[in-house]
């Protein structure tokens, strides 16, 4: 058995969940799973339909974006994943989609506001939208720079990637991550639902205000804080 078999299997399992969850059309997204000890990750091959995937088709890449094992070209977003893994040692899996509502917010260049407890259960802050990159970055190493768009946005907002596990890239689409593939896929699905709920909320009440901080903190802390009491 290949030493990369585990992460290839997990990456495959994560990728095939995306169409089942309604997060992708055709080949519009990718999941990767990292092995930080080995400095590699497995990712979906570029342009391959989800129903044609298999664990063997996952491409193993190092944290510099170099292919280590695989016969197919890795996702065109590979360098973005590589930058994130290289700078975020506790990030175990990354999901990138073009899910409808989250992408619409990204194209609108808007953060997703924290309007209610569903949002606060998963994020203590608005979901940030990183600003579009400048022309020099676009014309340079575009996918590489996308990774730094994400990292720099989190730094500028004083947000930890361990606490906020989702983001929008302006004029592009959402990214989500987690310590495990399961959590990263979960976060990608949650992000799409938060985007949908926020959109509907603004249609019902265009002047709606963000939820008050005390309620945000209560819901986030009861699920994620030191004294969390949600779940078993």
Please tell me what each predicted stretch does.
Residues 1-232:
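Glycine-rich flexible loops
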């Amino acid at each position: 058995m290949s030493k990369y078999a585990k992460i290839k299997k997990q990456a495959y399992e994560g990728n095939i969940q995306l169409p089942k969850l309604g997060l992708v059309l055709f080949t519009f997204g990718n999941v990767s799973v990292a092995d930080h000890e080995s400095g590699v990750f497995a990712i979906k091959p570029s342009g391959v339909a989800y129903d044609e995937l298999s664990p063997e088709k996952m491409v193993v890449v190092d944290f510099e974006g170099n292919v280590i094992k695989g016969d197919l070209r890795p996702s065109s977003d590979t360098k973005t994943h590589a930058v994130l893994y290289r700078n975020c040692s506790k990030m175990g899996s990354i999901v990138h989609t073009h899910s409808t509502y989250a992408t619409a917010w990204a194209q609108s260049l808007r953060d997703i506001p924290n309007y209610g407890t569903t949002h606060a259960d998963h994020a203590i802050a608005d979901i940030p939208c990183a600003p579009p990159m400048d022309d020099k970055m676009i014309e340079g190493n575009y996918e590489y720079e996308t990774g730094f768009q994400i990292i720099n946005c989190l730094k500028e907002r004083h947000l930890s990637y361990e606490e906020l596990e989702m983001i929008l890239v302006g004029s592009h689409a959402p990214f989500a991550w987690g310590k495990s593939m399961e959590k990263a896929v979960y976060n990608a699905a949650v992000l799409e639902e938060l985007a949908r709920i926020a959109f509907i909320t603004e249609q019902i009440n265009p002047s709606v205000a963000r939820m008050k901080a005390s309620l945000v903190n209560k819901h986030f802390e009861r699920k994620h804080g030191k004294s969390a009491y949600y779940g078993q």
